[in-house]
Every structure is written in structure tokens, then in C-alpha cells.
Amino acid sequence: MPPKEKDVLVTELESLIEHLSDDNFASSFHFSDELLSLNDLKLLTKKPMFIIANINDKTDENEVLEFQKKISDNIHLVTIDVKLEQDISDLDPNDQADFMDEMGIKESALTRIIRKGYELLGLKTFFTSGPKETRAWAAKKDFNARECSGIIHTDIQKGFIRAETVSYSDYIDNDGEQGSKNSGVWRQEGKDYMVQEGDVIYFRFNI
């Protein structure tokens, strides 16, 4: 590295150290391309982060907003009522949905936490389903069909022919694969197809 570039990098590193010394997160620091290229930094507070805050029915909404203002703009907040979630889990599974509807709860805290984690990591979920098993797979949001097939096995990616797919909602509404085919919602897609959140996929391949 030329001396001039080295001096610039040293100056930026000193600025970063000062930023961190003031109790700031690395995620709120403006990184130059040169600084980002230093893989050895491995700064923990630069990683995607969210805070889970336990609240209850007496929690003042303004307190939550004030807390949100105090943390970095790059850190997200998920609020959950642990006691309420415990009460829901203690109910009979058949009664849980009715209770959640009555309380105006659209999804469980666990679902919201997982969704936020996926959002921050830039992930999406697709499914494979067969006679013995239905399985969820995590993939990067920008992965196409061929790249997603490689998550299951590299041989599938190497011998990729096509992806047969249907949305999760259509799959459920039509009672599975055969019903989806009969209804005309079962599609055939090529290797560049951008897999959508919740797609149910059957990968055709040859090795």
C-alpha cells in the first residue's frame, strides 16, 4: 500500500477508535471502502442487531419511544409481553388462536423475532415438500432458483434443469402438489427465477 493511502487509512482507524471510545456502535460509523476492505476488524457492533424489550399492559408507549430514540438508528426494537406469551403457551393449542384473535394479536412474539432476524440478515424462506417430509430452507434474498437448489445439495445445483414451484398460500388452498397442478397454479421456472418468500419448490436436476 502506498504511504499516502496508508496515512489516510490510519487516520480513519483513529477516527473509528474515537467513535467507539465514545460508547457508539460501529454500525453508526461511516466506513470508507478502504476501511471496509480490512476483514481483520471483525467489529461485533457493526453486525445487524436488534433489541428485544419486555413490556406489559401497563407499559407507557412514550417510554418505549424514548428508549428507541436513545439507541442507534441502526438497531431495531422488538417489544414482547413475556407474561402474555406465557399465558398463551399454557392454553390448549386449539384455544390459542381464538385467544390471540380476542386480544388483537396477529402473530406470536417468536414469529416476530424470527421475522426481524431474517429481515436484518437479508434472508427469505422457501419450502421443499414430499411424502415423508416438508422442510423450510433459509436463503439470501437475492438468490435465484439455481442458487437456492445448492443450499439443499451442490449436486442439485450442478445438474439443475428447472424449478417447479407454487406459492405457500396456493399450496395450502389447493391441498398440496396435485391440487395445485389441477388448479393451474403450479409453475415451471428456469434457473434465473427469483425465488419468492414462502415458495414451495420441487427441483428437477440430472447428474
Set out the residue ranges of the language-model regions.
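C-terminal-of-GTPase-core extension/linker across diverse P-loop GTPases
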Residues: M1-E197, I201, N206-I207
